[in-house]
């Protein structure tokens, strides 16, 4: 196998699989530093995902699901030929997840995912395989807010969106796409010896938008200076309230 952990964080980015559950079911999970037949163990555990087309049973599966979470609808289809008489095996899977607005205000979701795998059993000792997958995704984010904001606006409040020309627009939009290609050559030397050679290509693309307000007041509605607690607890804020109250009484 080939290690596809992120080079910066040291972890695997599962969002790159993009909801392709049926395509990545064939896996082995090893906990801790226990010895694994496919890699050295690690403190966080080790997972090996088998993408060879011969690992999938022949058949077709399609499903549609509805949700009220990050996305509203999910459609997926998977087809596998199994190992055919000519020594070839093919598997393909596709998924689409979408939401005009999720359960959190101002969050949309649009994600596609694809998986293609081909394998050729040359003879009893040699086989070659090629697999590719990716999940181009565009989604908007929600923010973590304080209990004070939740008390005023509810648990689904999200300060990252607003109206522009009468339409909802999010200031935090994520675009991600991690296309990956994996090629393998298996050589059975003897009944007890196997040589496995792999080649992998992985390209990571991740971008995130945000409001720019350099040298200007923070425009976020949940900015702490805009909350009642700041006016009540801050010394200058309390002084301002007292002055305002006095002027109001004088009028």
List where the protein language model places each region.
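Residues on the lipid-exposed face of transmembrane beta-strands in outer-membrane beta-barrel proteins
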Residues: 75-81, 116-120, 181-187, 197
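Transmembrane beta-strands of outer-membrane beta-barrel proteins
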Residues: 58-62, 88-92, 128-130, 195-199
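Acidic/polar loop-and-plug regions of large Gram-negative outer-membrane beta-barrel proteins
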Residues: 119, 127-186, 207-251
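Structural signature of outer-membrane beta-barrel domains
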Residues: 4, 67-69, 97-101, 135-140, ...
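Short acidic/polar hinge/loop motifs at secondary-structure boundaries
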Residues: 4-31, 52
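Outer-membrane beta-barrel channels and translocator barrels
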Residues: 83-86, 121-125, 190-192
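Short strand-turn segments of transmembrane beta-barrel domains in outer membranes
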Residues: 26, 34-36, 46, 51-81, ...
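Residues that define the transmembrane beta-barrel architecture of outer-membrane proteins
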Residues: 41-43, 65-66, 71-75, 108-112, ...
């Amino acid at each position: 196998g080939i290690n596809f952990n992120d080079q910066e964080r040291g972890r695997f980015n599962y969002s790159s699989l993009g909801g392709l559950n049926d395509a990545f079911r064939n896996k082995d999970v090893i906990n801790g530093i226990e010895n694994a037949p496919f890699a050295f163990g690690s403190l966080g555990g080790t997972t090996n995902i088998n993408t060879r087309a011969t690992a999938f049973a022949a058949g077709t599966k399609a499903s549609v699901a509805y949700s009220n979470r990050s996305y509203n609808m999910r459609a997926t289809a998977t087809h596998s030929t199994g190992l055919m008489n000519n020594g070839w095996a093919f598997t393909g899977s596709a998924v689409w997840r979408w939401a005009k607005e999720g359960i959190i205000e101002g969050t949309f979701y649009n994600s596609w995912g694809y998986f293609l795998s081909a394998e050729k059993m040359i003879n009893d000792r040699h086989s070659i395989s090629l697999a590719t997958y990716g999940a181009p995704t565009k989604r908007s984010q929600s923010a973590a807010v304080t209990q004070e904001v939740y008390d005023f606006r509810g648990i689904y409040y999200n300060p990252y969106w607003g109206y522009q020309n009468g339409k909802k627009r999010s200031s935090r939009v994520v675009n991600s796409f991690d296309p990956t290609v994996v090629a393998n050559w298996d050589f059975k030397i003897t009944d007890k010896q196997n040589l496995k050679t792999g080649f992998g290509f992985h390209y990571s693309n991740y971008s995130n938008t945000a409001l720019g307000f350099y040298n200007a007041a923070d425009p976020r509605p949940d900015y702490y200076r805009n909350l009642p607690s700041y006016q009540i607890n801050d010394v200058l804020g309390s002084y301002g309230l007292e002055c305002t109250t006095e002027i109001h009484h004088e009028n």
